[in-house]
Amino acid sequence: MRTATKTRVTAETSIELSINLDSAAESTIATGIGFLDHMLTLFAKHSRINLNVKADGDTRVDAHHTVEDVGITLGICLKEALGDKASINRYGSTYVPMDESLGFCALDLSGRSYLVFDAELTNPKLGDFDTELVEEFFQAVAFNTGMNLHLRVLYGKNTHHKIESLFKAFGRALREAITINPEIKGVNSTKGVL
């Protein structure tokens, strides 16, 4: 089974996270940050990954450490659960509309970490959530998974809708990339390793 569990404790946060890449069972997500919980729930649904997260962070300061550390821990678990990446598609891409907004994600589980984030998030806050943390989250995921991740909002007006389209697109593109393809023998690379 392609699963992973990680507990990550720092002076700023305590994160418990588990994933099962091959189960769409209902996820349990409690980060203490309502907007992040909402986005992770959407990600889990659209990736068809069972995701369980419990986070306790120094949110009295702000949400930055918790958001980043959840991203780090998710990336570590994705990397572990993918193992040697044998027979996975490796690549995934999709567009996702959310009302007036259109989000795009393309990714490569190459082992080489990179993030391109092109999204004009015009509202700096959604409730208490700093929208600049969306990029921080995806940076942490990409760099700890070993993923080349491109995210773009092509257009839109509502900042919530823009961010939601990105999380859904990320989930759907990741599902495509992690799907095992019986036509792929070994890893999907001429190098023989990812």
Curated annotation (Swiss-Prot):
Pathways involved: Amino-acid biosynthesis; L-histidine biosynthesis; L-histidine from 5-phospho-alpha-D-ribose 1-diphosphate: step 6/9
CDD domains per UniProt: IGPD (cd07914)
GO cellular component terms given for this protein: cytoplasm
Compartments where located: Cytoplasm
Catalysed reactions, as listed in the record: D-erythro-1-(imidazol-4-yl)glycerol 3-phosphate = 3-(imidazol-4-yl)-2-oxopropyl phosphate + H2O
Signal sequence, start to end: none
Keywords: Amino-acid biosynthesis, Cytoplasm, Histidine biosynthesis, Lyase
InterPro entries: IGPD_sf, ImidazoleglycerolP_deHydtase, ImidazoleglycerP_deHydtase_CS, Ribosomal_Su5_D2-typ_SF
One of the record's GO molecular function terms: imidazoleglycerol-phosphate dehydratase activity
Keyword Protein biosynthesis recorded: no
Alphabetical list of Pfam families matching this protein: IGPD (PF00475)
EC class name: lyase
Location (main, coarse): cytoplasm
EC number(s) given by UniProt: 4.2.1.19
GO biological process, one term: L-histidine biosynthetic process
PANTHER family named among the record's database cross-references: IMIDAZOLEGLYCEROL-PHOSPHATE DEHYDRATASE, IMIDAZOLEGLYCEROL-PHOSPHATE DEHYDRATASE HIS7
Family: Belongs to the imidazoleglycerol-phosphate dehydratase family.
Identification of the protein by name: Imidazoleglycerol-phosphate dehydratase
